[in-house]
Curated annotation (Swiss-Prot):
PANTHER family: ATP-DEPENDENT CLP PROTEASE PROTEOLYTIC SUBUNIT (PTHR10381:SF70). It comes from Chelativorans sp. (strain BNC1). It is an enzyme of class 3 (hydrolase). It catalyses: Hydrolysis of proteins to small peptides in the presence of ATP and magnesium. alpha-casein is the usual test substrate. In the absence of ATP, only oligopeptides shorter than five residues are hydrolyzed (such as succinyl-Leu-Tyr-|-NHMec, and Leu-Tyr-Leu-|-Tyr-Trp, in which cleavage of the -Tyr-|-Leu- and -Tyr-|-Trp bonds also occurs). This is ATP-dependent Clp protease proteolytic subunit 1. The gene is clpP1. SUPFAM superfamilies: ClpP/crotonase.
Amino acid sequence: MKNPVETAMNLVPMVVEQTNRGERAYDIFSRLLKERIIFITGPVEDGMATLVCAQLLFLEAENPKKEIALYINSPGGVVTSGMAIYDTMQFIQPPVSTLCIGQAASMGSLLLCAGHKDMRFATPNARVMVHQPSGGFQGQASDIERHAQDIIKLKRRLNEIYVKHTGQDYDTIERTLDRDHFMTADEAQAFGLVDRVISEREAIEAPRTS
């Protein structure tokens, strides 16, 4: 069965613009990239993470001070892929705003809260879910033990990131992430995952271009 996200991407509309050299066609996402808008849509995995990181670095090279906007609608995915995006967001110079449309679950929620302070948003009907990392291992007992130790270290590191960006204490984060924890947009704001719930564009301050 085909991945519905891949199927949808094959149906991306084209935008035609008039230039001094005649007409030029862009796919809609390339056109939005010109406006410094990046989409994180669907499962977070290495291929998607590579594209998102490349777009972030490209936009930094174009203008190291102008805001970049990340639109997130993701169920989460591979932790290391998400951490690649997270680290790139923190590494580059431009402030990165985040906006949850639809859902931001698992690694999606971590990327949502990792936006620049006061520039993290969710739409009214967005859903957010946080939880601890999960994984399955097989092999020799000593290898399984090492994998278990590693995922415990990873859990601790993810908790520390949520502490940093939400303002919650470590015990609260650990308790909240112990199981799948679902939040409405307003609950996500109260928890510190987003700064504001917005229903119209005017509610977002003008992009920072200084």
